[in-house]
């Protein structure tokens, strides 16, 4: 008899069983997991599935128990738990060949990024719901040359503003999609406000949330593909959703990005966009980054300056609206967090260096002893 129950991830032994089970399927049990369930036969784990927010993930069934309707049981369990948590719509990732399986369970395919991944969804708060909301805010955009920029702005800098100015000089309208995923040191609500304040004097610029479909936990799945394929899967899926669903619905003809000479993820993302957009008739413009003297303006440079109390550098890199925010209570709390995280990194680096030095000393002593 097969029974199902929650797997308590706070129990190391329970979690270890799930990790080992998923490893057998080439799945990595990492990331923002809030709930995991298991199917058991005579005490043996034979199937599992998890929730990370509204995303269903890490669904796997032991080979000898497949084709017995157990996938339906896992999905039913995860949907029930989602409803208990107030989640009215789910998303799921799978490999392209598995799309028909989940379509038979009522999921609709959002996009497929061959040969890596597919995103499906069911319930409310779907991509169409998101696009309907955004269209009501923006208007149709018909007859206009409409461009788009996706920004995280952690925080908003003069470099971001320069990118918007460049886009506006080349388009009738510019839509800024603010990355909604709250994994940055500056909270989404604060970043969204900083962007709006930073461009409020620019006619033809509108700021909207990127929702669950632009650089989010939904479009950047990090858990079911190992090795070098992971980054290609993430970037290609995100670019495909934008090119095939978002851009056509909002009459976007061009997307602008800032030049990124060194960050591996951003370089891969830009390359994926260049490839996918060219196949879908969307222009892709890479804009050189702005410098102040010999220093490139970047959000990471601003965060470093905040950690170092380097107000001279900060004033050179951010607009007055961002500078004013730094003096607010919300801004001060974020700055304290930045300083704390910077201090922790310093201590960790020091500890690592000391361990390496001690290890080298032991090795040197051992060599002397052998002689």
Task: Identify the role of each PLM range.
Residues 34-47:
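Conserved beta-hairpin
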């Amino acid at each position: 008899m097969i029974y199902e129950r929650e797997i308590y991830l706070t129990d190391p032994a329970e979690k270890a069983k799930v990790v080992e089970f998923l490893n057998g399927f080439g799945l990595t049990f990492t990331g923002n997991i809030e709930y995991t369930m298991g199917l058991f036969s005579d005490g043996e784990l034979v199937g599992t599935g998890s929730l990370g927010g509204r995303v269903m993930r890490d669904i796997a069934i032991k080979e000898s128990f497949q084709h017995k309707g157990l996938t339906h049981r896992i999905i039913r369990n995860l949907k029930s738990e989602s409803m208990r948590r107030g989640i009215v719509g789910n998303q799921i990732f799978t490999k392209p060949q598995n799309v028909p399986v989940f379509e038979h369970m009522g999921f609709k395919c959002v996009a497929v990024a061959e040969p890596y991944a597919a995103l499906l969804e069911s319930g409310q708060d779907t991509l169409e719901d998101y696009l309907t909301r955004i269209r009501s805010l923006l208007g149709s955009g018909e007859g206009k040359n409409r461009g788009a920029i996706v920004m995280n702005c952690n925080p908003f800098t003069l470099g971001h503003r320069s990118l918007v100015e460049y886009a506006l000089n080349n388009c009738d309208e510019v839509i800024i999609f603010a990355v909604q995923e709250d994994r940055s040191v500056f909270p989404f609500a604060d970043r969204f406000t900083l962007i709006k304040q930073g461009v409020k004097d620019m006619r033809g610029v509108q700021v909207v949330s990127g929702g669950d479909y632009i650089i989010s936990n939904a479009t950047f799945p990090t858990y079911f593909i190992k090795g070098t394929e992971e980054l290609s899967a993430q970037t290609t899926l995100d670019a495909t959703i934008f090119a095939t669903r978002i851009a056509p619905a909002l009459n976007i003809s061009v997307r602008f990005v800032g030049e990124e000479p060194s960050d591996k993820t951003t370089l891969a993302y830009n390359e994926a966009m260049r490839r996918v957009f060219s196949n879908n008739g969307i222009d892709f413009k890479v804009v050189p980054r702005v410098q102040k003297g010999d220093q490139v303006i970047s959000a990471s440079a601003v965060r470093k300056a905040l950690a170092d109390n380097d107000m001279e550098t900060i004033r050179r890199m951010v607009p007055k609206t961002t500078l004013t925010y730094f003096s607010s209570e919300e801004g001060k709390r974020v700055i304290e967090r930045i300083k704390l995280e910077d201090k922790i990194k310093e201590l960790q680096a020091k500890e690592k260096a000391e361990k390496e030095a001690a290890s080298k000393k032991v090795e040197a002593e051992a060599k002397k002893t052998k002689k």
